[in-house]
């Protein structure tokens, strides 16, 4: 092999390695946060605990994101209590991570229903709107929009963060619907789609 051929082969191999490394590093980590857990039930109406729904939907979203090749970290995988500060710490371990906290809503006025998302920063707003757009476009309920709110998990998280409220379990109709596996599948599909669409803009 001539010196010129060797040098050409070396730099070709080097370039491929650099491109592969860049592609690997470009993968955005998504941190999914199933709200509440353990001693913290969250909302509880008509025998349904929010913490259980949150974890179920988060696990479904995880599967869908991983099928798209998006790496996922969960703040909890079982019915355990995780403090708000520690949830943010988990997200902050991953530079550039996208953090999504999954919840179900409740209100003393049982007629209130709908889906809404929350954010703290301009980038978080884009993430929240991406999920809100898809959820509201697919699900027959009130579109309560994306709003800025100083939730602790959002303010303590350094990266892009949003919180999604998947429906009011205090509303009897939404409670029954959210209690079904097929509906939680739909929620997961649209949340995952919204997250993936946002990640594609990074």
Predicted feature descriptions by range:
Residues 1-4:
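N-terminal secretory signal peptides that target proteins for export/translocation
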Residues 9-20:
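Bacterial N-terminal signal peptides
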Residues 21-26:
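Sec/Tat signal peptide C-region and signal peptidase I cleavage site
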Residues 27-29, 48, 52-202:
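Active-site-proximal helix/loop segments of hydrolytic enzymes
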Residues 28-47:
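Short glycine-rich His-centered loop
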């Amino acid at each position: 092999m001539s010196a010129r051929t060797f040098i050409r082969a070396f730099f070709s191999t080097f370039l491929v390695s650099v491109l592969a490394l860049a592609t690997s590093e470009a993968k955005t980590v998504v941190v999914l946060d199933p709200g509440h857990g353990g001693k913290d039930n969250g909302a509880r109406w008509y025998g349904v605990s929010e913490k259980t729904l949150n974890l179920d939907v988060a696990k479904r979203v995880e599967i869908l994101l991983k099928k798209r090749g998006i790496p996922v970290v969960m703040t909890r995988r079982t019915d355990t209590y995780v403090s708000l500060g520690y949830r943010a710490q988990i997200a902050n371990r991953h530079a550039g991570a996208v953090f999504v906290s999954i919840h179900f809503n409740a209100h003393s006025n049982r007629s209130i229903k709908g889906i809404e998302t929350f954010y703290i920063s301009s980038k978080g707003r884009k993430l929240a709107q991406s999920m809100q757009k898809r959820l509201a476009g697919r699900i027959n309920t009130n579109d309560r929009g994306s709003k800025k709110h100083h939730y602790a998990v959002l303010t303590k998280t350094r990266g892009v963060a949003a919180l999604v409220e998947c429906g009011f379990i205090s509303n009897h109709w939404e409670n029954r619907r959210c209690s079904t596996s097929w509906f939680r599948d739909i929620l997961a599909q649209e949340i995952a789609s919204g997250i993936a669409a946002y990640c594609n803009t990074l």
